[in-house]
């Protein structure tokens, strides 16, 4: 049976493989058109690229007014620039920035089918949709762990950060803020989409609080591991980004948190109700994050200064 709509080009391409003359002709015309387009694009720039000498024009100085900013803002911009300047850093430690909005859009698109399915499977456990969707947000957010290797990535230039006229805590707080900013903002997309596909209940609000609490917990845990497991003997930045024990612990802790959040609810937490369960989980998560935040501000800052 012939297909129609967006899948029709694939149908024609498949028919060409069966020996259909018209389909083979159409496929050949499309390939030739693409070839002609690429030829036109390359003919404009290929010769210039291959004959370039690498010489560049002399830079002309233009006086500009520099806007004054606080030390905290300057440190934040420094850490953000370090993250965006490294493709390896962004790809391995910031994948959640892309996947969180994608997950939200998918939920908005398929939420009308997913939520009734969850209710049908776990009908006896009320509020299961809120807990499981919150679990999904936490699992995707765990892919952001840019604070964990940030201390080790200072490398031989660590002395610069230590010699700046700022406190060690200010330097650590800037690293913490980068992960929080780059995770909270994308996470708002799926959380808002959850509000669009689920009824407005206390458990829905608490699922958002739990997800944001986990993001704070994850950032504090990652930076704590980064300070305690700092290594400056690497020869490639991929070593602290992908191969360090601190990054591995941070990554697996996010998965374990998601498993615990969903698993404990399905085992026994549903008897408390989704709202009470999420409130308890959020409180415990914030308490753990608060303890690590206090350690970073006191002993962690001293340890960073002594590295």
Predicted regions: what they are:
Residues 1-159, 167-307:
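Hydrophobic alpha-helical transmembrane segments of membrane proteins
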């Amino acid at each position: 049976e012939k297909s129609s709509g967006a899948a029709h080009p694939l149908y024609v391409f498949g028919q060409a493989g069966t020996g259909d003359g018209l389909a083979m002709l159409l496929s050949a015309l499309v390939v030739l058109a693409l070839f002609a387009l690429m030829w036109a694009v390359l003919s404009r720039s290929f010769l210039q690229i291959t004959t370039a000498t690498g010489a560049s024009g002399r830079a002309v100085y233009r006086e500009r007014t520099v806007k004054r900013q606080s030390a905290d803002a300057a440190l934040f911009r420094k850490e953000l620039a370090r993250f965006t300047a490294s493709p390896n850093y962004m790809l391995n430690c910031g994948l959640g920035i892309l996947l969180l909005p994608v997950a939200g859009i998918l939920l908005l698109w398929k939420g009308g089918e997913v939520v009734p399915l969850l209710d049908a499977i776990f009908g006896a456990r009320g509020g299961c949709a809120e807990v499981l969707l919150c679990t999904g947000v936490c699992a995707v957010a765990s892919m952001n762990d840019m604070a964990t290797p940030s201390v080790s990535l200072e490398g031989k230039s660590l002395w610069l950060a230590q010699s700046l006229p700022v406190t060690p805590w200010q330097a650590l707080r800037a690293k913490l803020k980068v992960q929080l900013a780059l995770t909270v903002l994308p996470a708002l997309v799926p959380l808002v989409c959850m509000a669009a596909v689920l009824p407005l209940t206390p458990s829905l609000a608490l699922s958002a609080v739990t997800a944001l609490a986990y993001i704070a917990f994850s950032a504090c845990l990652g930076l704590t591991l980064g300070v305690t497991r700092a290594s400056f003997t690497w020869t490639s930045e991929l070593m602290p980004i992908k191969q360090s024990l601190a990054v591995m612990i941070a990554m697996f802790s996010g998965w374990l948190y998601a498993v615990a959040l969903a698993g404990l609810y399905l085992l026994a937490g549903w008897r408390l109700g989704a709202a009470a369960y999420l409130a308890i989980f959020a409180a415990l998560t914030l308490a753990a994050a608060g303890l690590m935040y206090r350690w970073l501000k006191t002993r962690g800052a001293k340890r960073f200064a002594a590295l």
